[in-house]
Amino acid sequence: MFSGGDYGEVARWLANFVTSHAKRESPRVEAIVEAEGERENQSYGVRLRLGKRVLPPPGTPPLEPDFADVSAHRGDLAWCDALARRVRELARQLIAEEREERRSA
């Protein structure tokens, strides 16, 4: 497996990873990976979007994996499995909230 990489390369890998696992729950879920501003070269902000709904919602902290941690562990299957579980749980929560919103409308 692979690890390491510069900030941009790791950001692309993380965006693909999050997208892949979120879409396993629903192809309509989109990944948002924030990699600019205060986070640049330090960490990433991860959110998921389904329609107009975003989790974690704006104004609250996103999932925030550290650049060094992602870079060092992206080749570690156990670490990737733990991150995939977090992403998929967030996607399931987003889908459930959207369904509930449609039912009550």
Regions inferred by a protein language model and the residue ranges of each:
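Intrinsically disordered, low-complexity regulatory regions enriched in serine/threonine/proline
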Residues: L83-A105
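Negatively charged, low-complexity tracts enriched in Asp/Glu with abundant Ser/Thr
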Residues: M1-G37, S71-R85, A105
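Intrinsically disordered, low-complexity regulatory segments enriched in Ser/Thr/Pro
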Residues: L50-R85, E89
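Long beta-sheet-rich domains in secretory-pathway and surface-associated proteins
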Residues: W13, P58-T60, R103
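A short, glycine/Asx- and small/polar-enriched loop/turn
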Residues: E38-V46
